[in-house]
Amino acid sequence: MAGWQSYVDNLMCDGCCQEAAIVGYCDAKYVWAATAGGVFQSITPIEIDMIVGKDREGFFTNGLTLGAKKCSVIRDSLYVDGDCTMDIRTKSQGGEPTYNVAVGRAGRVLVFVMGKEGVHGGGLNKKAYSMAKYLRDSGF
């Protein structure tokens, strides 16, 4: 899936993200392309199922993981028509900084972006939304 790396590169180009990924969530349920060396590279099918699953409440209470990194769900509009995004924040383990994460849902793929320290979640949400809309409009 080397062609998908250009989408990740596009998400990274403005310098506000430390990581980005394109992840299949239908039949090809795995990471299609991701920033090298990041946590998104390690996202598992079980983690994908948690994000796109029918239970839209459990992760507010229990959190979720992305590439084994513990996270809290801030806002879930993944299945809201016209939005199709989710806002997440990493949890601090051992005093390291926390980061905003946004997920955008297209027809067959999820777009993940993680901001650098201090990057506001609203801009990340717009970035994930825009790429997911472009991919959805392109048949993905």
Curated annotation (Swiss-Prot):
Q: Which GO terms describe its molecular function?
A: actin binding; actin monomer binding; ATP hydrolysis activity; phosphatidylinositol-4,5-bisphosphate binding
Query: GO CC annotations?
Result: cytoplasm; cytoskeleton; extracellular exosome; glutamatergic synapse; postsynapse; presynapse; Schaffer collateral - CA1 synapse
Organism's domain of life? Eukaryota
Q: In which tissues is it expressed?
A: Highly expressed in brain, skeletal muscle and kidney and less strongly in heart, placenta, lung and liver.
Location of the protein in the cell: Cytoplasm, Cytoskeleton
Question: Which UniProt keywords are given for this protein, alphabetically ordered?
Answer: Acetylation, Actin-binding, Cytoplasm, Cytoskeleton
Matching SMART domains? PROF
Gene3D superfamilies in the cross-refs: Dynein light chain 2a, cytoplasmic (3.30.450.30)
Single Gene Ontology BP annotation:
positive regulation of ATP-dependent activity
What Pfam family does this protein match (any one)?
A: Profilin
Which residues are reported to carry the modification N-acetylalanine? Answer: A2
Indicate the quaternary assembly.
Occurs in many kinds of cells as a complex with monomeric actin in a 1:1 ratio. Interacts with PFN2.
Homology family: Belongs to the profilin family.
Q: What does this protein do?
A: Binds to actin and affects the structure of the cytoskeleton. At high concentrations, profilin prevents the polymerization of actin, whereas it enhances it at low concentrations. By binding to PIP2, it inhibits the formation of IP3 and DG.
- Please give the name of this protein: Profilin-2
